[in-house]
Amino acid sequence: LIAPTTTKKRMKLIVKDSHQLIYQVSNVNITGGKLKSTAKTILNNYKTIKSINPKKHVIIGFGITKDTIGNFKTANGLVIGSACCKVISNAIKKRQNPAKNLNIMLKDLKSRVI
């Protein structure tokens, strides 16, 4: 994990010692919360990580929503765990098909980054 508060020195160590995947925490917040960092700041951190080792895959997570996801098209991947949990939970409460509702949401999000 690399957080917005991670120093450049520590970032280099994490990238060097990591396997092929690095999780970039987009902001300091609770899961499912709104972004407190700007998309520009998050992308600058992403570019810094990639500049240390371009071969590492970096996924961005924490605060990614349908309104912000389009800003992160250059990322190797995005984590939207809380959004998925909300869709599943709401579908169950409404006695709807969670898989169908999740598929609809994921197609919408995918269309915003491709």
Regions found by a protein language model. Give the residues of each.
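Catalytic cores of alpha/beta
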Residues: 6-16, 52-53, 60-78
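Hydrophobic faces of well-ordered beta-strands that scaffold small-molecule active sites
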Residues: 1-2, 22-24, 56-62, 78-80
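Surface-exposed amphipathic alpha-helices with a cationic face
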Residues: 42-54, 106-114
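Glycine-rich phosphate-binding active-site loops on the catalytic face of alpha/beta enzymes
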Residues: 23-33, 74-94
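Active-site-adjacent beta->alpha loops and helix N-cap segments on the catalytic face
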Residues: 6-13, 31-48, 67-70, 89-100
